[in-house]
Each structure stands twice: as C-alpha cells, then as structure tokens.
Amino acid sequence: MPRICVLGAGIMGVSTALAIQERIPDSVVTIIAEKFSPNTTSDVAAGLIEPYLCDDDVDRVISWTKSTIQRIQEYMNEGNPGAESQEQSGYWLQSVKSVPKWLEVMKNVKILTGNELKMVAKRPEHKFGIFYTTWYLEPTPYIKWESDKFLKNGGKIKNSKIQKIEDVEKEFGLFDVILNCTGIGARHLIGDNEVFPTRGQILKVKCPSVKHFFIDDQFYALLNDTTITLGGTADRHQWDRTINPKISEKIFQENCKNIPSLRSAQVISSHVDLRPSRVTVRLEAEPDSKVIHNNGHGGSGITLHWGCALECVELVKKVLAGKPGISKI
C-alpha cells in the first residue's frame, strides 16, 4: 500500500488528501500540518467562486474552476448545512472594460446597458458593468465535511510544524509520495522564493437587506450564509498580520458608498491573512523525485481547489509508476 503524505491542511491540502484517498483506494494518506481549520488562511476566505489574484494560463484556470463547480454541486446535492443556498448573483463594476474568458463558466452573464449601469453605479469610475451568477463555499463547514470523510475512510492527521521538507521522513517515516500544499509556507519549507504574501484585510458584517454581491476595482461585498465579507486590501509582499483599524474603517465606508444599505450593518469582526501568491500556480512533480507541489493559488484557493486536487491525483499515479511528470501547459 503506497504511503502518501500531504503537507498543509487548508482547503487545498485537505481536498488533495481526500481526492487521492478516494481515487487511489489502496493508499494510506496522512495530512501533516501546524494549523487546522478553523485556523487556516482558507477559513478567512469569503469563498466566492471566481479567479482572483491568480496569474496563470486562463484555460488551465477555467478547467480547474469547472471541476470545483461540479464538486460544489455534489456538496449541495448531499444536503449539507447551508449548502442549499450556495449560488449568488451580483455586479462587477469596472473603470476599464474587461470581459475575461473565465466568465464562460458563470451563469446568467449579462453586460449592463447604459441605463442598468446608472441604476447600480455609485462612482464616476464605474464605467462598465457585468451581472452574473456564481457559487460560493463557506470554507469552514466545507473543510470539516472533507476532513470527516477523510478520517472516516481511514486517513491520518498529524499536528507538526515541519521546518524543511527533508524533515518529514525523519519524524514520520518513509513515504512514497510527499505533496506540498503549504501555501505561503512553501517559501520556507522548500525555499521557493517565487512564493510571496499578498496581505488581505477584511470585515465580516451582518446586513440581511443586502441580496447581491458587489465588486469594483478595489472594494467588494460578498455574501456568505449569515454574514457579508467586506474587502479589501491586496498588499503584495507584506507579511504583517496586524489588523489596522483605519483600514477596516476605510473598507467599511467605501463599501457603504457602493451599497448604501450597508450603513445599518452590524460589524462582527475584522481579519487579516496572507494569500499565497506566485507568478503562476505551481502544480507539478519534481523530476526524479517523490515530491509534488500544489501551491501559489493567490486569492483563488477556494475556486481552484478541487480541479487542482484531481490533477494531483494523476501526478501521484505517475510518481508511483516511476514516471514523475510536469503538469504545466
């Protein structure tokens, strides 16, 4: 039975471990991580399904996103708590017209007419708009759902802070394949200097009267089951996880300009975390190695998670067959 190790327990790590377990049935899969849900970067995410802060080949991103959407629909069909309402519609307003190819996987896509734009635009820079329907995941219950399935199927979970990837087998014994799903941690774990943090600060608020998401060039209001996520910042190469009250206030006030009814919102909490950014997603097996990398998803970890997990399964099969491969296009 092949012994598989997955490093990292955010949505990418847990999904990858579960996908391997389900598709390579004789495998023994172990997740090793320092932090687990609800204390991962994934848990802070709003969970809207659309590529965000992810610089990669668009066809590759679309393929991964389609797999994730199919997965979400399966999750919804199982009747999981809150899953029945995991579609939402809203507006994306822009200062410069952009109709990216990934919109083809969204539903009800409509370019706003001049009159429609006037009805929703709140700033002079809102010169172009798109309405569409997408999906979202509440990350914490979803990761729990996956983790429960993983454990029920015989998966193992170990709590450990691994400093270097070479230390894994010193502490836990030999593995046939080791997958790096450590997000920003890959910078230190394997010395990948192309991984860098993009600092994101958000607010969680309650405002039941808001029924649509709203995104513009800088700010966004995204609906969750019981709250709304207001953002945001995207500060590249910033490691500071300290909440800045002035930034929180600006996020709130600027979103109120876009959605005036937010002024009655109840502020629940503020959060800061570091998106694991990279020039391109690294999803590949190192040549002549047992190590596979699956990291650098930027702000799109939720959007891409299941597509990337399925691709990892194929890479694991190649490594086990003695044919490590590279999945770059």
Curated annotation (Swiss-Prot):
It catalyses: a D-alpha-amino acid + O2 + H2O = a 2-oxocarboxylate + H2O2 + NH4(+); D-alanine + O2 + H2O = pyruvate + H2O2 + NH4(+); D-methionine + O2 + H2O = 4-methylsulfanyl-2-oxobutanoate + H2O2 + NH4(+); D-asparagine + O2 + H2O = 2-oxosuccinamate + H2O2 + NH4(+). Keywords: Developmental protein, FAD, Flavoprotein, Glycoprotein, Oxidoreductase, Peroxisome, Signal. Pfam families: DAO (PF01266). Its cofactor is FAD. Its EC number is 1.4.3.3. Residues 1-19 form the signal peptide. The keyword Oxidoreductase applies. FAD binds at residues 9-11, 34-35, 40-42, 46-48, 161-162, 182, 275, 298-299, 301-303. It comes from the Eukaryota. InterPro entries: DAO, FAD-dep_OxRdtase. GO terms for biological process: D-amino acid catabolic process; digestion. Gene3D superfamilies: D-Amino Acid Oxidase, subunit A, domain 2, NAD(P)-binding Rossmann-like Domain. It is an enzyme of class 1 (oxidoreductase). It is found in: Peroxisome matrix. SUPFAM superfamilies: FAD-linked reductases, C-terminal domain (SSF54373), Nucleotide-binding domain (SSF51971). Belongs to the DAMOX/DASOX family. Catalyzes the oxidative deamination of D-amino acids with broad substrate specificity. Could be responsible for the degradation of diet-derived D-alanine in the intestine. May play a role in egg-laying events and early development. Homodimer. This is D-amino-acid oxidase. It comes from Caenorhabditis briggsae. The gene is daao-1.
